[in-house]
């Protein structure tokens, strides 16, 4: 995609340059469904063959799970059933407890077509996996929060991270997480 965030930059820094050149010579970008905060995901459509497109979607774990029906597991594609969902949750919750942000990646192949791809195309995906990133708080965060508290200022945190990541970060900077309110708690209020 033309728009890169820090997670994209981290992924690209970890890519083998020769492999990237080989892949970029074989694959062509066909379209893009941009990120938005409602879907919390974005997709690119690429093609290696003229008659087949591949939609690759990345985003917040729950949003990717919501549009996935299968998962690649030990090299096989299997149904994304309750057992697999529990396994995924166990692993990703553990990563979140360590303060790691998790971005999920899913895909599907489609017959090539003319015209733009839409949100509706982000369905019946195969969860390919997830990427965990450490985004540690800045060294100046804890002292700044301590100074605010000493001045009688109450700090509230608003984040797009998971509840578990937010709790870990709050702990690291000496901030009592207190009562946590998540987006699904607020949605009915609007």
Residue ranges of model-derived segments:
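Cytosolic catalytic regions of ATP/NTP-dependent phosphoryl-transfer enzymes
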Residues: 1-127, 133, 146-147, 155-171, ...
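Short acidic-hydrophobic, aromatic-tinged amphipathic segments that line or gate anion-handling sites
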Residues: 131-134, 180-182
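The conserved cystathionine-beta-synthase
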Residues: 137-149
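Short, charged, surface-exposed secondary-structure boundary motifs
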Residues: 188-190
């Amino acid at each position: 995609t033309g728009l890169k965030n820090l997670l994209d930059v981290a992924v690209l820094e970890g890519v083998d340059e020769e492999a990237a050149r080989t892949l970029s010579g074989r694959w062509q970008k066909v379209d893009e469904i941009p990120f938005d905060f409602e879907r919390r995901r974005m997709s690119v459509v690429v093609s290696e063959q003229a008659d087949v497109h591949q939609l690759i979607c990345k985003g917040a774990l729950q949003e990717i799970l919501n549009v996935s029906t299968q998962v690649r597991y030990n090299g096989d594609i299997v149904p994304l059933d309750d057992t697999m969902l529990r396994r995924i949750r166990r692993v990703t919750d553990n990563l979140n407890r360590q303060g790691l942000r998790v971005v999920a990646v899913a895909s599907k192949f489609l017959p090539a077509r003319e015209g733009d791809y839409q949100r509706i195309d982000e369905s019946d995906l195969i969860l390919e996996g997830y990427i965990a990133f450490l985004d540690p708080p800045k060294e100046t965060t804890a002292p700044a929060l301590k100074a605010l508290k000493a001045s009688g200022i109450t700090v509230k945190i608003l984040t797009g991270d998971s509840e578990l990541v937010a709790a870990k970060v709050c702990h690291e900077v000496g901030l009592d997480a207190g009562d946590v309110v998540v987006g699904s708690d607020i949605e009915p209020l609007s």
